[in-house]
Amino acid sequence: MAEVGVLLLNLGGPDKQEDVRPFLYNLFADPEIIRIPVPPLQKPLAWLISTLRAPKSRKNYQAIGGGSPLRAITNQQGRVLKKALAARGLDIEVYVGMRYWHPFTEEAVRKIKADGIRRLVLLPLYPQYSISTSGSSFKLLDQIWARDPSLKAIERITINSWYSRPGYIRAMGERVREGLDKFDNPDGVHILFSAHGVPRTYVDQDGDPYQRQTEETVDLVMQSLGRPNAHSLAYQSRVGPVEWLKPYTEDTINELAQKGVRSLLAVPVSFISEHIETLQEIEIEYREVAEAAGIHDFRRAKALNVNKTFIDDLAEMVIENLGVYSR
């Protein structure tokens, strides 16, 4: 049995319709997602929000098959990453820990402990760091370690972000190129990078580096792409009445249409796997927005999923952070 492990950290998603409301409750009960000035109100408010949002969310998940594919894709990424590490001569176990649904991070840590892992790489499947994504998972892991003194025997090696890694940037460029080449006139297509938004206060007040890292990602991808296409960056998936990072994706689509754009490639920039935000929000909702605005050639670049360039780069990242040699 390997004594070295990798823990892939991700959001999680409901596997079936019955999971939607409890998944939403777990999401909104996290103070890094919804900040409530009175902490005792966090869970009651999470119950209310999840109950009110569940019917619409179920409908959205129904439109993509009834549930989220994120668990299956992340498990597949774990298997392919393990093979990529083995191909480099390394016996490393790969685990999956989701923040808001099964397999929960707590479940993964129990398995890691039972397997006798001594060195553990924490690899968030979020290229850009945010308080609300990687930060929330790291905080949870700190709490788990604090509750169980025996876990202190496990050395934790944390990867905070990896948005500028050449392999990741190349893989993103491959996906954009694949998407562009499906158009009749690839050079005339406007590329719209759509990233998950965060509340504006996270950046302005708390110093969250997410916006800066996302903007740098887009710049690096466009440099790697080497195409003449015009491009924009916008933010999606906002929740609640507070201001989130702007511009919002739907507003940007309408503005581009007003400027005469008729061919648009939407590129999910902070999502490395297909899930509700790519398959439903971009693929269905934003397509409808685009067509209503007069953009009739709207397409979406695929998420990275198990793209070989991407998985190979994850393997190299693990090796570099462990400080070991591979063949």
From Swiss-Prot:
<dbReference type="GO" id="GO:0004325">
    <property type="term" value="F:ferrochelatase activity"/>
</dbReference>
<keyword id="KW-0350">Heme biosynthesis</keyword>
<dbReference type="GO" id="GO:0046872">
    <property type="term" value="F:metal ion binding"/>
</dbReference>
<dbReference type="InterPro" id="IPR033644">
    <property type="entry name" value="Ferrochelatase_C"/>
</dbReference>
<dbReference type="GO" id="GO:0005737">
    <property type="term" value="C:cytoplasm"/>
</dbReference>
<dbReference type="InterPro" id="IPR001015">
    <property type="entry name" value="Ferrochelatase"/>
</dbReference>
<keyword id="KW-0963">Cytoplasm</keyword>
<dbReference type="Pfam" id="PF00762">
    <property type="entry name" value="Ferrochelatase"/>
</dbReference>
<comment type="function">
    <text>Catalyzes the ferrous insertion into protoporphyrin IX.</text>
</comment>
<dbReference type="InterPro" id="IPR033659">
    <property type="entry name" value="Ferrochelatase_N"/>
</dbReference>
<feature type="binding site">
    <location>
        <position position="277"/>
    </location>
    <ligand>
        <name>Fe cation</name>
    </ligand>
</feature>
<keyword id="KW-0408">Iron</keyword>
<protein>
    <recommendedName>
        <fullName>Ferrochelatase</fullName>
        <ecNumber>4.98.1.1</ecNumber>
    </recommendedName>
</protein>
<feature type="binding site">
    <location>
        <position position="196"/>
    </location>
    <ligand>
        <name>Fe cation</name>
    </ligand>
</feature>
<dbReference type="InterPro" id="IPR019772">
    <property type="entry name" value="Ferrochelatase_AS"/>
</dbReference>
<keyword id="KW-0479">Metal-binding</keyword>
<keyword id="KW-0627">Porphyrin biosynthesis</keyword>
<keyword id="KW-0456">Lyase</keyword>
<dbReference type="GO" id="GO:0006783">
    <property type="term" value="P:heme biosynthetic process"/>
</dbReference>
<comment type="pathway">
    <text>Porphyrin-containing compound metabolism; protoheme biosynthesis; protoheme from protoporphyrin-IX: step 1/1.</text>
</comment>
<comment type="similarity">
    <text>Belongs to the ferrochelatase family.</text>
</comment>
